[in-house]
Amino acid sequence: MVKIGGVFVCLLIVAMDIVAGILGIEAELEQNKVKQLRLWIFECREPSHPAFKLGMGAAALLVLAHVISNLLGGCNNCICSQDELQKAPPNRQLSLACLVFTWVILAVGLSMLVIGTWSNHKSGASCGFTHHHFLSIGGILCFVHGLFCVAYYITATSTD
């Protein structure tokens, strides 16, 4: 029963991150459909409400997948010193590395999604520096996040 639950959790995390990635890429495509005027590195364009909604959905799913993997992965990675890290079994070291990578990918991916989504929040046209590909890069990082979350969950819940 535990193995079936673990498989379900892994599939849930992967599905949420895949949907988040697809929503991020779709948001980028919707953003590219609006009118824009570009002059060198400056750009004026209308915000896209569909891109805003898709970006918000992608960010929410990314955070939810991260929370689920961290809560269900457990908290057995408490390593307080370099000496403890060196004495820890390889499985625990790998688990800690995956945990660190999931947090880094979450920080970068969520930042990209929020910046890309925020540029579509305003009600009128805005001008400024170009914000190209933030949503699609955030979407791609959602896929990578799914891989590391599953690796973390598997290594954190497996026996040493």
For the regions a protein language model found, what residue spans apply to each?
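Membrane-proximal loop-to-helix boundary features in eukaryotic membrane proteins
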Residues: M1-I13, V19-G57, L71-D160
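Short amphipathic alpha-helical segments
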Residues: I68
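Eukaryotic helix-linker segments that join adjacent hydrophobic helices
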Residues: G57, L62-A65
